[in-house]
């Protein structure tokens, strides 16, 4: 990868602007999950240790450009960052035209989405960002799929543009999983709709050895194979698409294994009566809400023999205890497998937390939309810009 890495640069005495993803949930001024702040600390510490004058910025929510509001302010983040770093972290409100910061100091620059032109990647604004620093560091993988002034434009104009440790760890893990995977490569793609994961399925089917589908997506594939799915969430108009994906897999010698048993209920409720049925016994009024134990065991065996596992999406309604066993079985199989494993996506991370397996997954992506776009085979604007500067 032709990207300049921040870890390789001499930053002594340099003004360094770091774009982090500090977009954390805040309720009544209280941060409810500080995972992203904690993740950013090593990068900031490293820049300080290297003797840099450090400026950090991030977006928070979706403020109106050109107006400051307390609810969109990074003030609670500055307080938390100061506690984690053990140094003062002043919040600078109007910073586009210049920032005072000395080597060994760090300042947090107010929510960059408040700046007029940020969202549309305005060149004048991007040049102003670039003029603030000697080195720009892009460390926000979660926004790498957005072409904005602080994630794309500034990379073009900064004297030096580098990838930060968080961003590079994410890119290295994804490259290891997709570009040069230990075989067999198995992907789990689950979710409510084929339509939302269509590009993902279409891209992965050309890379994987096994593709396990789950949730509403699986129901559409089950229907495409000629089985009844009752009242289950599925997309009849996408049956031809599902058949094409299956044909593409077969042509490559890859496999999309379908469930042989499922867990059904008559209502979509946490306390609904759950019944295990073979796939050909699903009634017209049944809802398929999980894979059955036989299927879960078969999938777990595939995971155990995989060299690489990419996991995006729980295979059942794991929030309801009666319909969580499929997802739990696969989660535990991933945790105990020797494969290189990468997990990403909001619901997937919730499952990782629920079953407490974070320490047993090789790499957990916090990238969200950027993670999905990478899996879809798309070029991420920030990554492309960093590669162009690294040539």
Swiss-Prot record:
Claim: Iron is one of the keywords in the record: no
Any one annotated GO CC term: cytosol
Compartments, record wording: Cytoplasm
Disulfide bond residue pairs: none
Catalytic activity reported: (2R)-3-phosphoglycerate + ATP = (2R)-3-phospho-glyceroyl phosphate + ADP
Entry keyword set: ATP-binding, Cytoplasm, Glycolysis, Kinase, Nucleotide-binding, Transferase
EC code(s) of this entry: 2.7.2.3
Annotated pathway: Carbohydrate degradation; glycolysis; pyruvate from D-glyceraldehyde 3-phosphate: step 2/5
Positions of ATP binding: 197, 319, 345-348
Name this polypeptide is given: Phosphoglycerate kinase
Organism encoding this protein: Xanthomonas axonopodis pv. citri (strain 306)
